[in-house]
Every structure is written in structure tokens, then in C-alpha cells.
Amino acid sequence: MANEPAIGAIDRLQRSSRDVTTLPAVISRWLSSVLPGGAAPEVTVESGVDSTGMSSETIILTARWQQDGRSIQQKLVARVAPAAEDVPVFPTYRLDHQFEVIRLVGELTDVPVPRVRWIETTGDVLGTPFFLMDYVEGVVPPDVMPYTFGDNWFADAPAERQRQLQDATVAALATLHSIPNAQNTFSFLTQGRTSDTTLHRHFNWVRSWYDFAVEGIGRSPLLERSFEWLQSHWPDDAAAREPD
């Protein structure tokens, strides 16, 4: 479409400036400060730098250490906020929110989320905040390139396999929405944003996200017309109250 931002031939949607050669030693030193008994873990990087997890870097690690006379080996996933010089998807990264949401969902439901282990919020260790969680075996639709682009296991899977993932996704969403007293349980997600209704907050968040993104990719007349239309046709009856 004319005047739309052009995206050329792209075969990678993420770039990481992370130095994978120094990462194991840095993570090992930090882990020694959070593991009990003064453990001195050995850390190796398995995969993940610049491969998937578009909104944050997702790095697969294996840590080995001695604890109470036992040898422990744990496969972990590090979720790391991107550096400013890389390709941040969001203007701010609240990994503490992600950590707490995953923890609560794991405690309150049977949704298959990984166990979250430790979080570093200052950015002093890796340059940006990160947290570690247990590695979970499975297959995940890729986001580099997005699975909707084709040429991946999900796009090429038979219809029954795609349906299996779709049904599991809907079941997980239904379970999440059945968490009792969710408004209070997850109130930390809306701190400082209580003046508007949920619908207004969501619209304003999407609009602010767009305003952040246009600095890097240019404006979209289609999206801007959509924002204008929504504001002119605001569903007053729904917007005036919180969802049931």
C-alpha cells in the first residue's frame, strides 16, 4: 500500500550485541551469590542468543554445582531485556512483572509454565535486567521468523497437529481467566494507571506503543486511520465499566 512503511527482505528480526563468550562466567559469578552454601556453579550456553524470543533475549543455559554433597545439573532459560543499541520491541521492560506473573500462574493454576528461579533487576550483571527459569522440553512456534510467515513446523504441520496447539492455547487462556480475584492478585500490573477503565488503558497503551515504534519504522496511515476511527466510534456502554 502506498505510503506504508516498507519492510524489505528480512531473514532475522532480532539482533543481539550480547557477548556469548563472557556470558557463562558472568552468570556463574552471579549464581554463586544466590545459590545456597557458597556453591560455585559451572555454566555453559546451549543456544538461544539471537535465535528466538523477539521481545527479549532468550538464552538456554546448563548450570552444574555441588550442594549438600550432591552434584546438581539444571537446564535453565535466561530471559534478558535487550540493550538499547539492539532492537527493543517495547519502550520499557518490566521483567519483574513477567517473573511475578509466571510465578503466580504456576502457583494458582495447572497452566504449564516453567518454574521461575531467580531475578536480577538492577542491570548491573548483564547490562540489563534478567531472570532465570527452568527449561521445559517441548516445541514452540518460532517468532524468528514468525510462524505465520510459513516454512516452519507449525505452518507445515497437519491440520490435527495445528488444532492440538490451538485447543491447548484456548484451554490455557480459559484457565488464566478463571483465576479468582485476579484484579487484586495481579494489581501490580496496573499500578499508577487506575484513572481510566480497562478498555481505555489498553487503547492508550497500544497507541503509546505505536508512537514508540514509528521512530524506527515510520508511520502507518492505515493504523493512524484505525486509531482515529476507534476514537470516533468509542463503545461508550462497554468503555464506561470494567469487564465482568
Q: What does each model-found stretch correspond to?
A:
Residues 1-8, 180, 197-198:
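Short, compositionally biased low-complexity segments
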Residues 46-225, 234-241:
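ATP-binding pocket architecture of kinase catalytic cores
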